Amino acid sequence: MSDTKVKVAVRVRPMNRRELELNTKCVVEMEGNQTVLHPPPSNTKQGERKPPKVFAFDYCFWSMDESNTTKYAGQEVVFKCLGEGILEKAFQGYNACIFAYGQTGSGKSFSMMGHAEQLGLIPRLCCALFKRISLEQNESQTFKVEVSYMEIYNEKVRDLLDPKGSRQSLKVREHKVLGPYVDGLSQLAVTSFEDIESLMSEGNKSRTVAATNMNEESSRSHAVFNIIITQTLYDLQSGNSGEKVSKVSLVDLAGSERVSKTGAAGERLKEGSNINKSLTTLGLVISSLADQAAGKGKSKFVPYRDSVLTWLLKDNLGGNSQTSMIATISPAADNYEETLSTLRYADRAKRIVNHAVVNEDPNAKVIRELREEVEKLREQLSQAEAMKAPELKEKLEESEKLIKELTVTWEEKLRKTEEIAQERQRQLESMGISLEMSGIKVGDDKCYLVNLNADPALNELLVYYLKDHTRVGADTSQDIQLFGIGIQPQHCEIDIASDGDVTLTPKENARSCVNGTLVCSTTQLWHGDRILWGNNHFFRINLPKRKRRDWLKDFEKETGPPEHDLDAASEASSEPDYNYEFAQMEVIMKTLNSNDPVQNVVQVLEKQYLEEKRSALEEQRLMYERELEQLRQQLSPDRQPQSSGPDRLAYSSQTAQQKVTQWAEERDELFRQSLAKLREQLVKANTLVREANFLAEEMSKLTDYQVTLQIPAANLSANRKRGAIVSEPAIQVRRKGKSTQVWTIEKLENKLIDMRDLYQEWKEKVPEAKRLYGKRGDPFYEAQENHNLIGVANVFLECLFCDVKLQYAVPIISQQGEVAGRLHVEVMRVTGAVPERVVEDDSSENSSESGSLEVVDSSGEIIHRVKKLTCRVKIKEATGLPLNLSNFVFCQYTFWDQCESTVAAPVVDPEVPSPQSKDAQYTVTFSHCKDYVVNVTEEFLEFISDGALAIEVWGHRCAGNGSSIWEVDSLHAKTRTLHDRWNEVTRRIEMWISILELNELGEYAAVELHQAKDVNTGGIFQLRQGHSRRVQVTVKPVQHSGTLPLMVEAILSVSIGCVTARSTKLQRGLDSYQRDDEDGDDMDSYQEEDLNCVRERWSDALIKRREYLDEQIKKVSNKTEKTEDDVEREAQLVEQWVGLTEERNAVLVPAPGSGIPGAPADWIPPPGMETHIPVLFLDLNADDLSANEQLVGPHASGVNSILPKEHGSQFFYLPIIKHSDDEVSATASWDSSVHDSVHLNRVTPQNERIYLIVKTTVQLSHPAAMELVLRKRIAANIYNKQSFTQSLKRRISLKNIFYSCGVTYEIVSNIPKATEEIEDRETLALLAARSENEGTSDGETYIEKYTRGVLQVENILSLERLRQAVTVKEALSTKARHIRRSLSTPNVHNVSSSRPDLSGFDEDDKGWPENQLDMSDYSSSYQDVACYGTLPRDSPRRNKEGCTSETPHALTVSPFKAFSPQPPKFFKPLMPVKEEHKKRIALEARPLLSQESMPPPQAHNPGCIVPSGSNGSSMPVEHNSKREKKIDSEEEENELEAINRKLISSQPYVPVEFADFSVYNASLENREWFSSKVDLSNSRVLEKEVSRSPTTSSITSGYFSHSASNATLSDMVVPSSDSSDQLAIQTKDADSTEHSTPSLVHDFRPSSNKELTEVEKGLVKDKIIVVPLKENSALAKGSPSSQSIPEKNSKSLCRTGSCSELDACPSKISQPARGFCPREVTVEHTTNILEDHSFTEFMGVSEGKDFDGLTDSSAGELSSRRSLPNKTGGKTVSDGLHHPSQLHSKLENDQVIIPEAAFWVLCCQ
């Protein structure tokens, strides 16, 4: 026994012509016995290139370049290395085997067979065999050679040497003596090499005929050529003889490329196909034997019997045989995967160990054993004769047959071989086939047909000579007999005229194509014409005497491919351009009624791809330019690291450019490969469909097959490779009365095999009971269909960066690019944390695998280590599924690095029946919840940042859900209703407005909103006459109101105007919506500007669709002969037309609650909310929701959506003094006197309503960076005072009190895309696959429309990412958490985490952080900055030289924006205004005025000294540690001081329309008092002025608000210019002469030259200064009277009329005091206050103290007994000022009672 391993040789073929033309790179290299496979460049990325793979084999044959003689291995070298060794072993008596393995086209047949000039391994071995026999044969040694030739196709064995063998399959049996064998296989005796050559040639012809008749691809069949060598040894002396029998098996395996595709073989086997079962099993056998040889599984089962091939090769694989394997590979880079698979296959095969023994004298032993077995069987049979055992009888017949074969003499074998050969020749002659050795070597004067076949071994093998009159058909009487699909008994006739002309005349209903064109009449043939008969019989005609005419040659050279050489075609019979592929492609192109439909597809895709690529690269370039510009501006020279600032910029830009270039190259290569694949698939699909339709039609199966297009499931995932074509052909299967099925190309391939077998049995009229495939079901249509992919839902995992749960209804995107329902999922982080960046341990050798991960904060310190992260995935339910696929719906997904897919099964309730309505949408409930523990690596972080969890949703068709007619739409449930369409492009937002007034506690409180039936604005605001007011505006989205990713980022401006008075009796009220009052006048306040625009766009789209449908219906109706497809198409068009009419009605009269914009409201709004919902139309691009222009300023959305009575009205911009941190809300100061409207200055009459319009401009960050103008009409009632009765009633009333009114806006981004599509996606895919070139009304073909639509899947995924990111951000804002950055991306903004940085922000960073910090936290540094206002949109930014500055204006941003936390990487698209779209949109803002008059900053210095105490000593200002952050260093302090100086010295921009207003310079208030040298006995340290982060803006309303007191112009009496100047001068002089102290006079600007009247002057002089005191004031704490305010100070304060309150604390209390603005109150005002507080306890009454007698001492004593808690919350308090005209009353008595609710100090002269 000889134990030897299988010898394995690898041979690499030369590049073929296609690879040379494509300049494909060679990836295979051979050195000695090593083969090196390099990864192709297109499959690798820079920095992660795969290492080359090295394999070692017994032999490596380099056959790439014949010119390299030292390395080149030709056919002779291959034979010497493999053939000679095999032959030697055969002569020694061992069994031997050579099998060739490799993909189709890798050179297997060439290596095994070769051709005439270069013979292959088999001919050389046979030739050497007979040469050696002739040398060694003598008297004592004789040789006998027998051959058999069989083919294994689809697990069936056919005898290629038996004329009848090609029509019937043979059975494989296994005998305990002989082992596996083929029952009935011809074993013919040969005596010479010529006999073998002849038999192989005739066997190949039989193989070709059979394959052509059945349209089988020979590359999928295995050919086994067996040579049995029998040596008989005679001992001349003793007369004994012995035999050695060896069998040499030469196996040409099928193409292996299909096995290399992962999962493909398994899928096909599941579908019941046997195409590659033999190869798959062969791989398993080789693996099992290799494991056995390696000692891994000694008892491992080897599945020999799983396929016919491995069963027959059992001895050759791991048994009694010397085996060699030759693996053929391609050197091209585009065959890398197939080559790698082949090399791995061969690498495992070389480990197999065989146990070969010499088969010496087997015959005698075998015959003896067989005879003993026969006797034994006869005995058993006789004993069991009564039982009539059929098994024993069959076994007996089998053994007797074997004995008979073994005892046949050599002479009888030769005679039998001769008989079979003659019968085979007669059969070929009857079919018209030439019996020449080589079919192409015929006489020059003969006309003949030569076959074309995809297999080079079978191509041009059959030659049919033409007579003068040749008949072609399936009947036995025809000259050329053809069998197969589409061949009629009498198919056509070919006639040769006397002058040499050859013509072809087809018969009726007989398909004949010449050069790809279907011919129906007599057609002249020329030399080289390609002829197709039936479905798959391709021939080329050779007419040596009839060359093409010169003019025809020239014409073809001009129009045809340039490489066609017709002269060569006429002289050489094997013209490469006229091969099988050329002829097949030619037929497909012509049959599809198009010059080149596939080329159309390719051209459209290429065109769109190039446009996308160009725009993407341009956008990339602009983005890098913007980033570089930002870096230059933000990293100013004094702040850059001195080491490598510019170098880093240059390096990063260079690296970025390299990445962009590499990305473009990879994408181009991927796109090119995808185009080639799509072309191949389309050709293949059309070929298969044509054959399937032939078979179905001939067998009357009433089934129709059509090629359609669909998106591959892999491309519906957001993780797919960009650049690949997102479309593939699919097969739509339709049968009358049944539902439509969609098959893949592979599935149809598998079904076709069964169809052919069934067709063959049907043709041979095999009885139904014996039909093999009748038991396996109908291959034409699946009665029990497998599951179908409904769609893929992509869940983006950015929520794992934040500790927030993502609850979202993810759209399920179908393979037509439509939403086929929604999957409700939850994704959350259970445990663990996401690090900002992954830090690798340098000490570890393999840190990336060690799992040592650290969470690093922004300062670089390690917080804690984390290794694991637990994620939870929940699938709740699927809604809106198409009914026809809603039977047993399940989900399947793979999370991150999980090896196996997770399946989520539905919750099945047997009591709930399935809906049977055709248009119903189905809901499936799941209870799936699973936790995943993953290692947090850089790859995982990149995955959750950029990738998605792709959940596939599968379903089965509902039983009985069929239709009685052909259907496309009728079974396709309409899941996209109008509500669904509009829901994706709409979102509602609410705008709430409340008005605040000063209350008795000095706080701004919301005024009441009274409901009234005649007012539909939400209510009437009750405003006190003459009070200071504020307007608070809040904008927030409405949850579950649509899926448009809308996010309001900030309120930019608030303006108010359009004051209108309406009588409740005579006129109808003004509202913010449409009213259908029958008794009103024609006045209508509802704006329909945007709604009309929406309806107009919608109507235009419907009109286009209607015109298209009319045209199509007319076209189909005018056809005289309508096919079934035409009838179906007409019914479908009419159905669409009816649906279009319904949609048209929905445009004009939408049903209430239908979700269509403009639909009547059918809801009960909350109190204060308007009932009807106005529409705002953004008019964005439907593909990516981008704006065509910058929607800012005068171009902002909603600017022109004016309300009635608004046009021409005057609006006043209100200075915004505060933004909310928790929501999008802004508070603006409102002085109603600027309107100069009598309706706002007087008390409103009983039957009158005052209406105003509040106009708010908000900044949207999503769906696009833009500005949006919102309007709300409000109603107001001005009253003077509440009576005691009214006050009492209000306090004891149980009614709910409302304080705000609102309006809900419906924001529409664009018209739904589905509305604009002329055909539904499924029909469009069919029309595109048919390649109908007729254009639509817009000039686009169907294929262009379909590909354009399919390529937008990427846009769908991008929008979905945006929607989910908005959902995450809304969830975060609900939790009121800061969004932190979770990835280590460069953060040039956050240069320092310990100080504010104003220099690093652009113009668009207008100070709208997501969560603003309180200004008071840093008031020590910013208290002298009066306010951080915002600049107007069009204000110029100028530097010191006067030119426009590129750096952002200092006042445009809150100084603490640098402290707002940076968002994670995935939130970049969420902040287009702040991050991505800088320098594009200017936020609207208002400036500070008269800043040049502001004094230098003083109070910001912690060391600032103010007068304190009675002794005149100074003490430093101490700041409250709870409300501020201390400055860490002098450097920061100096920097902030410089910033303050810059802020104060900036020149503001004054809008022209506000230039005439008076200016109140609040910056002077409380400034000069700080430096006063007056000895104030009760004074204490003044508290800092700035206590919040207000954004007080400009003088736009005619006045200026102070930052600390929040007082406005209305807080003081504003005299006219002359008098005020005189008054100011007088008071200044008086103060300076008495105390030499700067007064508190405000610097008024003269508004006019009008002087005060005497009455007004008197009023000013008689006004009363009342100062509210705080809880911790001196009076409240009971300070001794000795520390009271000197009377001279009181006089001074009274004269100036501009005093600030003094909040004096005991010196032991370190809490800083707080300054207050003066409040001037008339007697009337005081009386109102007293009436409002009727329930309080009055002080001083019981003690009999009067107002005049209230001294300083008593006042202090009084305050010590009756003190009030401070309810201002540490904030400054101010109140409104009465109009000067109201100051007409004087004190009527000297005694005024002071209520407990507010203590007052009367300061008068």
UniProtKB/Swiss-Prot annotation:
Protein name (database record): Kinesin-like protein KIF13A
GO biological process, one term: melanosome organization
Encoding gene per record: KIF13A
Coiled-coil region list: 359-436, 602-775, 1100-1138, 1518-1547
Biased composition range(s): Low complexity: 1612-1621
Annotated residues for binding of ATP: 102-109
Family as reported in the entry's similarity comment: Belongs to the TRAFAC class myosin-kinesin ATPase superfamily. Kinesin family.
Modified residues (Phosphoserine): 636, 1287, 1454, 1490, 1529, 1572, 1648, 1698
UniProt keyword list: ATP-binding, Cell cycle, Cell division, Coiled coil, Cytoplasm, Cytoskeleton, Endosome, Golgi apparatus, Membrane, Microtubule, Motor protein, Nucleotide-binding, Phosphoprotein, Protein transport, Transport
Species of origin: Homo sapiens (Human)
Biased composition annotated in UniProt, kind: Basic and acidic residues: 556-567, 1519-1528
Role, per record: Plus end-directed microtubule-dependent motor protein involved in intracellular transport and regulating various processes such as mannose-6-phosphate receptor (M6PR) transport to the plasma membrane, endosomal sorting during melanosome biogenesis and cytokinesis. Mediates the transport of M6PR-containing vesicles from trans-Golgi network to the plasma membrane via direct interaction with the AP-1 complex.
